[in-house]
Curated annotation (Swiss-Prot):
The keyword Nucleotide-binding does not apply. PROSITE patterns: SOD_MN. Belongs to the iron/manganese superoxide dismutase family. Transmembrane segments: none annotated. It is found in: Mitochondrion matrix. This is Superoxide dismutase [Mn], mitochondrial.
């Protein structure tokens, strides 16, 4: 069974950029619901497999994608953030960003634009294209997981569902995007980058 991962910091640790109320609801209610619903869906899926009921298996796939994606995405998101975050990455990741986007500022602009531009709910991502050996920016709707739907390996995810920012930033998604750069955990993003290069 899947379980809700602990946050590596307190709910209030990302203040003033993301307030404690948002973090508490987002982690203990929203992410917890994805985990619970994923477990229920997987149980039903196992039953359908055991019975050889292909129709039931197909019917369960949207719930598997939505709740499984929600669990995968949020598990990455919490580690991508840190009260000691912000600034720029260092070393090989910074070099790769400059190579693939021209500069760190241009990369920030592109990922911000992709995230702000998501229609409705979804995610903005920095991913790694293993075949090309390149960093790429992508946007995914709803809880579609990056790797499962695009093949890109997720390095940095920005949640642009309204539950991620509305209580603090209301309908002004660009203000939330400006703020989140102050808490990006570049050490975590770099670890992910180095791991997928092996």
């Amino acid at each position: 069974k899947h379980s809700l991962p602990d946050l590596p910091y307190d709910y209030g640790a990302l203040e003033p950029h993301i307030n404690a109320q948002i973090m508490q609801l987002h982690h203990s209610k929203h992410h917890a619901a994805y985990v619970n619903n994923l477990n229920v869906t997987e149980e039903k899926y196992q039953e359908a497999l055991a019975k050889g009921d292909v129709t039931a298996q197909i019917a369960l796939q949207p719930a598997l994608k939505f709740n499984g994606g929600g669990h995968i995405n949020h598990s990455i998101f919490w580690t991508n953030l840190s009260p000691n975050g912000g600034g720029e990455p260092k070393g090989e990741l910074l070099e790769a960003i400059k190579r693939d986007f021209g500069s760190f500022e241009k990369f920030k602009e592109k990922l911000t634009a992709a995230s702000v531009g998501v229609q409705g709910s979804g995610w903005g991502w920095l991913g790694f294209n293993k075949e090309r050996g390149q960093l790429q920016i992508a946007a995914c709707p709803n809880q579609d997981p990056l790797q499962g739907t695009t093949g890109l390996i997720p390095l940095l995810g920005i949640d642009v569902w309204e539950h991620a920012y509305y209580l603090q930033y209301k309908n002004v998604r660009p203000d939330y995007l400006k703020a989140i750069w102050n808490v990006i955990n570049w050490e975590n993003v770099t670890e992910r980058y180095m791991a997928c290069k092996k």
